[in-house]
Amino acid sequence: MNNRVLVSVAWPYANGPRHIGHVAGFGVPSDVFARYQRMSGAEVLMVSGTDEHGTPLLVQADKEGVSVKELADRYNRQIVEDLAGLGLSYDLFTRTTTRNHYAVVQDLFKGLYENGYMIKETTMGAVSPSTGRTLPDRYIEGTCPICGASGARGDQCDNCGNQLDPADLINPVSKINGETPKFIETEHFLLDLPALADALAAWLKDRKDWRPNVLKFSLNLLEDLRPRAMSRDIDWGIPIPVEGWQDNGAKKLYVWFDAVVGYLSASIEWAYRTGDPEAWKKWWNDPESSGYYFMGKDNITFHSQIWPAELLGYQGKGAKAGSVHSLGELNLPTEVVSSEFLTMSGSKFSSSKGIVIYVKDFLKEFGADPLRYFIAVAGPENNDTDFTWDEFVRRVNNELANGWGNLVNRTVSMAYKNFGEVPTPGELTESDKKILAQAEEAFGVVGEALAHSRFKQGITHAMHIVGEANAYIAEQEPWKLAKDESQRERLATVLWTALQVVSDCNVLLTPYLPHIAQQVHETLGRDGVWAAKPQIVEVTDDMPVEPIGVGIPEAGQTYPVIMGDYAAQQARWARIDVQPGTALSKPKPLIAKLDPELGETGPEWAPVNP
């Protein structure tokens, strides 16, 4: 097994700024995982981008009175700024309206088509009677015909987990305007999932390490596999590269067909932009490489069924066989890591209903790491979780400020005041050895949790060590030792021990709190970049594509991407010995305490009772 890890992160729609519910599901968990893997020595490739096709963008563009391209350009830039500000360490965060993405998507489609896994059928398509526009499956809701649950979507019922078609729903209505959709006959290309069922089942049944809810849901999908439409009656999207279809401006590829291909196209673009066009193959063609996919629970289907099926069919590994195409044998996901929903006042975040906290506003007032901490320790890892300002304030004040911030501040302050540097320790007592051993053992405990995407378990144990370190200082009472010259060696030993544990805890918390970790690194008298920050880079869409493809965008558009030189950072998953004699400076406050009243009212821009 090599040590290359692909971290594929769900693509956010470019139809509005991101709110904290979005980043709780796909953003922070994936970054914690990627940062830990890099610190452990893995060669990580973390990719994503803005999803700029599909009806959601058309609907929003209509609302704002702008073209879809204008809308996508604006929100692509806003989302890039949001995610970079949060410290998400993408090797490449790009977009789906690039020449490269069009070409790669069309290559995947043609491979599936030539292998017989894209079939033409006449289906019943839903359209809006008032606009004539196609309604996506997810924009139609009704009663599930199988279990009777209300609120079932046109693609699946979350209550029973069964796949549906919009025409299956009882009393279907459009989520856009509440009208009853009209169903018309239309011809589409469908992914022949039944022909790939055995291959999908064989792959899924080997996924022993997945979160139980994700694996159970994915296995249930196999029970009623039907061909699924991969084209849509829509004028905004990627053209269908088949004779007789490619010039039809009213039919495009389904947004979810092209979005999941984005993990591959982004990897190819990353390789080009870093000067080694073949480098992507190390993560995609080498079966020893691993790939982890992060998303919210509503997107499991596309990552544990649709995307693996596309990959299997492209390589001719279904019942119809077929050949391997130009991109070679491509790796299927090692694990699909899904989070539940972050809610507010018991409801899903909704901009239209005013139930929303935007990332941009949150970062401006509180910075990135308090939000990252909250999502890690109290977020929707395994269950839907309600965000409240009261809990946010309580956790920041009691855990981050009083716990971690206090440990760093008082340890470094006492060492600086009494020695001006990291002191030389004397003989260690059993108490010293115990806390040092606890901190060292935590690398294994927290590392094991992070390697298996158990982020809440990992940060809980790391903060337990912080608590043990604070208890150690309270027990040793170095402020009393400082008043007795005969206890100077013991004072030096206690403070050296505490500084070492601070250093250890900083390593443990780095994947979660990279911005604070850099501050602590400097507070301990160390130079250089400990935890690298992502950078926003303006690029030009000038990438050569072969084959050219159908209807691809013209070269020359410029757009922002997120990249970063993470290989140059010093952070590693191991004890970093504190060196006696290292100069210290008076520490600055690490984490500002919040006004408790904020927990009752919320900030002006997101009040508790709007």
UniProtKB/Swiss-Prot annotation:
UniProt subcellular location: Cytoplasm
Motif ('HIGH' region): 12-22
Co-factor: note: Binds 1 zinc ion per subunit.
Motif mapping: 'KMSKS' region: 348-352
Catalytic activity: tRNA(Met) + L-methionine + ATP = L-methionyl-tRNA(Met) + AMP + diphosphate
GO BP of this protein: methionyl-tRNA aminoacylation
Keyword annotations from UniProtKB, A to Z: Aminoacyl-tRNA synthetase, ATP-binding, Cytoplasm, Ligase, Metal-binding, Nucleotide-binding, Protein biosynthesis, Zinc
Matches recorded under InterPro entries: Anticodon_Met (IPR041872), M/V/L/I-tRNA-synth_anticd-bd (IPR013155), Met-tRNA_ligase_1 (IPR023458), Met-tRNA_synth (IPR014758), Methionyl/Leucyl_tRNA_Synth (IPR015413), MetRS_core (IPR033911), MetRS_Zn (IPR029038), Rossmann-like_a/b/a_fold (IPR014729)
Annotated residues for binding of ATP: S351
Enzymatic class: ligase
EC number: 6.1.1.10
Binding site for Zn(2+): C144, C147, C157, C160
A GO term from the CC aspect: cytosol
Cofactors that this protein relies on: Zn(2+)
Entry-linked Pfam families: Anticodon_1, tRNA-synt_1g
Molecular function terms from GO: ATP binding; metal ion binding; methionine-tRNA ligase activity
Description of how the protein assembles with itself and partners: Monomer.
Function of the protein: Is required not only for elongation of protein synthesis but also for the initiation of all mRNA translation through initiator tRNA(fMet) aminoacylation.
Family per similarity comment: Belongs to the class-I aminoacyl-tRNA synthetase family. MetG type 1 subfamily.
HAMAP family: Met_tRNA_synth_type1 (MF_00098)
Protein's name according to its UniProt entry: Methionine--tRNA ligase
Species per Swiss-Prot/TrEMBL record: Corynebacterium diphtheriae (strain ATCC 700971 / NCTC 13129 / Biotype gravis)
